[in-house]
Amino acid sequence: PHQLVESFKSTLDEVREADILLHIVDISHPNFEEQIEIVNKTLAEIDGLDKPTVMVFNKIDAFNYEPKEEDDLNARTSLNNSLEDWKRTWMGKAEHSIFISTLKKENWPEFRELIYEEVKQIHSKRFPYNNYLY
């Protein structure tokens, strides 16, 4: 939440030391898009946007939406998007994003592989002649 950001800025300064950021999003929260925006603004304020970031959309098991009836003439809102709809947006198309359920371990092997590949890439750049680990 934005009201807590100021008190946590010193903690968030650790972002500058990180090699990779995991941006964990509670996709079941009705305002998750706003929360993403707040995190991105905060990262920009502390010069943290230049870090490799993996977007992790968690709690897919708890995700709910309001299906839009075919005869409903009201404008479609983000509340009408199914999980599959969200996966067809930038959220699912981004190279470094994944939809998971930590509770039910859905897409857990894919998540682990994604993190492994990201760390491997960073390690290979930092230590180019030390690839025996992979």
Positions of the model-derived regions?
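Short, solvent-exposed loop/turn segments at secondary-structure boundaries
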Residues: 1-4, 33-34
